[in-house]
Amino acid sequence: MDKSLFYNPQKMLSYDRILNFVIGARGIGKSYAMKVYPINRFIKYGEQFIYVRRYKPELAKVSNYFNDVAQEFPDHELVVKGRRFYIDGKLAGWAIPLSVWQSEKSNAYPNVSTIVFDEFIREKDNSNYIPNEVSALLNLMDTVFRNRERVRCICLSNAVSVVNPYFLFFNLVPDVNKRFNVYDDALIEIPDSLDFSSERRKTRFGRLIDGTEYGEMSLDNQFIGDSQVFIEKRSKDSKFVFSIVYNGFTLGVWVDVNQGLMYIDTAHDPSTKNVYTLTTDDLNENMMLITNYKNNYHLRKLASAFMNGYLRFDNQVIRNIAYELFRKMRIQ
């Protein structure tokens, strides 16, 4: 297949963000490209790298790390010893499981400029996220990067879901129809894989998976873990009613009486006196702590809308937060 069809990270790198998320079709070459890039940086500039997976068992075959990219560097010796990577006899990088990040706190990595975290979004058949996973990655980044400027962490994933601990933690709501969603210090890239998909459909395996859910992810870069049920932008006639603060997120609740629908959105009226929270962690001035939603008119209406199917959510992230909220309210 033509090399130009595969993923090229140069545009993403040009934005120079410290934290980057690349979510692309399976087989498009994300992992391959993000092996080649740090190898080149080491050969040219002596910059080291760290390769991260979530758990130790995922690094069981790390000895094969260089196998697929060795052809790109015929004049260099690429060797793996344990969880260390060597290029031309010099230490170039480390493989680290995120689950043991605490053991790295006392280590120093002054020459590491790139961290690559592969498969940062959990797939259905994989192991769970580790507890406080985003904080674990941030701790690792802090240990490695310290206060240096020319550094970056690149997180790779197949198109599984835009609802994940990382986007929730940083309150990132990407437009899945845009290739680059750029924020102050972070970036989300969703590569266009149309030409790649067209060519891959011509292969025997491509024909096999075409039209299946797996094919939607692998060929079309569709987020197969994200249902569109109840996802709907609020109507122009909807009116703001109240806000709920949950896990640091402020959710605005809107009502369209003509359509008989209620909406949850990030948009809200900051001057409203109707602000509720369910936890003391979120409680602040000018908020009401609600321990039983049945005792509050607004939350009873919200629960009723949810249970009767006339509640809508602005996007996948908002829906995920709201579902956690309803579980907290003991509404299943």
UniProtKB/Swiss-Prot annotation:
Changing D118E: Complete loss of DNA packaging activity. It comes from Bacillus phage phi29. GO terms for molecular function: ATP binding; ATP hydrolysis activity; DNA binding; RNA binding. It comes from the Viruses. Changing R146 to A/K: Complete loss of DNA packaging. It holds the Pfam family Podovirus_Gp16. Homopentamer. Interacts with the packaging RNA (pRNA). Part of a DNA-gp3-gp16 complex. Keywords: ATP-binding, DNA-binding, Hydrolase, Late protein, Nucleotide-binding, RNA-binding, Viral genome packaging, Viral release from host cell. One of its GO terms (biological process) is viral DNA genome packaging. This is DNA packaging protein. It catalyses: ATP + H2O = ADP + phosphate + H(+). Its EC number is 3.6.4.-. Belongs to the phi29likevirus gp16 family.
